[in-house]
Amino acid sequence: MNTPTDLKVTKRDGRLEAIDLDKIHRVVTWAAEGLENVSVSQVELKSHIQFYNGIRTDDIHETIIKAAADLISEDTPDYQYLAARLAIFHLRKIAYGEYEPPHLYDHVKKLTDAGKYDRHILEDYSREEFDELNAYIDHERDMSFSYAAVKQLEGKYLVQNRVTRQIYETPQFLYVLVAMCLFSKYPKETRLDYVKRFYDAVSTFKVSLPTPIMSGVRTPTRQFSSCVLIECDDSLDSINATTSAIVKYVSQRAGIGINAGRIRGLDSEIRGGEARHTGCIPFFKMFQAAVKSCSQGGVRGGAATLFYPLWHIEAESLLVLKNNRGVEDNRIRQLDYGVQINRLLYTRLIKGGNITLFSPNEVPGLYEAFFADQDEFERLYTKYEQDPNIRKRIIPAADLFSTLMQERAGTGRIYIQNVDHCNTHSPFDPRVAPVHQSNLCMEIALPTKPLDNINDPDGEIALCTLSAFNLGALNNLDELEGLADLTVRALDALLDYQGYPVEAARTSTMGRRSLGIGVINYAYYLAKNGVRYSDGSALGLTHRTFEAMQYYLLKASVNLAKEYGACTLFNQTVYSQGKLPIDTYKKDLDAVCNEPLHYDWESLRADIVKYGLRNSTLTALMPSETSSQIANATNGIEPPRGLVTVKASKDGILKQVVPEFETLKNAYETLWQLPGNEGYLKLVGVMQKFVDQAISANTAYDPGKFEGNKVSMKQMLKDLLTAYKYGVKTLYYHNTRDGADDTQADIQDDGCAGGACKI
């Protein structure tokens, strides 16, 4: 048997030479510098046993990285940095052929000539500006990544050939180039200052960017909106136009929300009875095929959530579309579903009444009123219930809601949209710009209008551009003022920078300029401040934090409106009438959280009325599975599943350790330590008081805490009503504890069926 010293290795150029164990030792020792509880010899031992004669130098490096990553544990969390440094070393060798990165200008020129980068970067910036930025870039920041972060960067974000897996750049170039692209149209006198500040904010993880921006800005493909909302009308032309729009956007990195709630029910009359309608299911299948026709720009698989009202005449057949029973003909399992509910339907449930199902085309005005005017909806609904000439199905509300919650529990991916909250506590005036749907991950609430053809100028496709503040990286809430200004400027510039494959999306985006800025690392933020999800101790801090965030973002958008003018559809917002989120939130929250307001909302109100806003919306709290890993942060507003979680994605199994594990391990509250959903839902309600769009809020159930190890229907319905009571607009995943070890609990797909509208 060969001893490691006898082995020959295959160099990159194909030559064979004796293995240099000293060199390996030097690299591992360098990577271990300053880290605690890591053993160089253990990494070497673990990797040596996997070496073989003729092994390629690349494979040696990969083996050592993997050996270090396998040692990551609660007792030895620093191996995540040792493995990351080795991976960065390897990455630079692959991208540049050596450890030292090239000059920024040389790098950009080389990749532009190769067709990987957009030519405008070389055209817009002078050689002197390149020199100044090259001197500013801090490549040492690559050393602060965790292993999970480097693997996510390699898999999803760094510009590469996705077929051969050849990577062409390293993280600091990614960050500075995103900044250069977004601020390229700013005046020469100020733009380098913005580029540097934005580079600092993103490369030190204070601001987190979504996948489409990280992987796409600087390349020739210019579509970076994370979420696309497409509404379909009750006509074949519109169904075809919707299908084309889905294909166009799925191929360009976007996740889709489809509103199909207007489509008439099975056996409705077509052309006055000349034909019978085949119902929704054949058309939903068509949408599923369109969604799955492309992967999102090679970065992730296509994904969509489809919306319909709970009172649709086919509701009973639609609620079961995702489950594992039934046959192919009556199941559409590759879409997620958003079921739309309002006050009247909940009232019928509470009072033990019935729900009447209708086909939307047979009840004039009802579908529009469902979103725009709750009193009018109630008047029409009861009127149509009493009309003997209208086709209907009557079901006990308890039965329909039980089916809904059973399917939500069984699949985890039947989502809830409270459409009244989405319109009464909204930046948009529902009389002129009602919100009819949400998006893939349930955090977007923007107006849409159906298309009759793909070039329909009267249709409206809503796009939302996302990013997030890292709460854990803030020193104080006033820091949000500068970060809000930078982020709003960058994302607003992005709207003009990107291309629009469908005209209905361009006109809508140019008119509304909607942004969705959220947060990551909330669980760490709570732990660091010594408060918890479950006991009410975090309510005050959460109120202060989200107040500051919404206040400073609105302020940034007013300042931008002073410079560039308000968005052209500002008159369709309630902001133009002087209304603010602090006026329209659900007052039931006051009994839960009595924290006063700390900012000068009245002078902000006056400024908004006077100057307008550059952006109709500013906030949305999205899931952030991937970009949280980059920042080594906890996911969005979620409690972690364990202090060390194992995540499986197509780039392999990754271990992630919560921030400041050593000092805060007893301060964290993990998902399955929460006694129930109530504490979490109250916090979501407090966030929703300020957040102008919606929140990807999840519910979680541990069957072990229930009689007979079965989650009770009563508890699920109680949580649904609690969420409604506190003004929560949407509910996303339903998580069930499956009894696996907590460190393994996160092995699933990338969530969001491919992660499109998360960051």
PLM regions: where:
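Polar, glycine-rich mid-to-C-terminal structural blocks
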Residues: V320, D329, R333-T411, V419
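Core nucleic-acid recognition elements
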Residues: M1-T5, V38-V176, M180, D193-Y199
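Catalytic alpha/beta core of large soluble enzyme barrels
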Residues: S126-Q152, H436, M442-T448, L491, ...
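Internal maturation/activation junctions in enzymes
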Residues: A201, A484-R506, M510, R532-S624, ...
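Function-dense linear segments that define catalytic or interfacial modules
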Residues: V159, Q166, F173-R191, V195, ...
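A glycine-rich phosphate-binding loop feature that marks nucleotide/adenosyl-phosphate handling sites
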Residues: K46-S47, I65-A67, L82-F89, A201, ...
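Acidic, low-complexity intrinsically disordered tails
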Residues: M1, Q744-I759
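Terminal amphipathic helices with adjacent charged low-complexity linkers/tails
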Residues: Y79-T112, K151, I341, C422-D452, ...
